[in-house]
Amino acid sequence: MSDERCALVLEGGAMRGMYTAGVLDCFMDYDISFDAVIGVSAGALFGVNLLSKQRGRVIRYNKRFNSDKNYMGIRPLLREKNIVSTKYAYDTVPRELDPFDDEEYKKSDIPFYAVVTNIRTGKPEYVQIKSVFEQMDV
């Protein structure tokens, strides 16, 4: 019996994460799993789809909504002071337009951690995400 364990760490990097999304799809194609998954920024946003078993979702919604003025651009920048609309990206898209399967995600026995920065200390913290919809603000 082996005590070896293997975790997957997913980097951030905005649209550079599209390469990561393709690798995650490949992992799903070949049924490759890990003992834990850790993601920061885009790695966290894209990595949850591995546990929800939603192959192709990241690439699909980024291609579909990338040119949507409500999703990314000057409109969200003026309204929310963010180049990407957090309401649209984290609420409208995953709940209505390209649904995220939070129930399938919660069934996974693989723990998923989002890396966040403690604004008081500047140090990283690792938050286990048990429900994407319930912990979206992380």
Q: Where does each model-flagged region fall?
A:
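Patatin-like phospholipase
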Residues: 1-40, 48-138
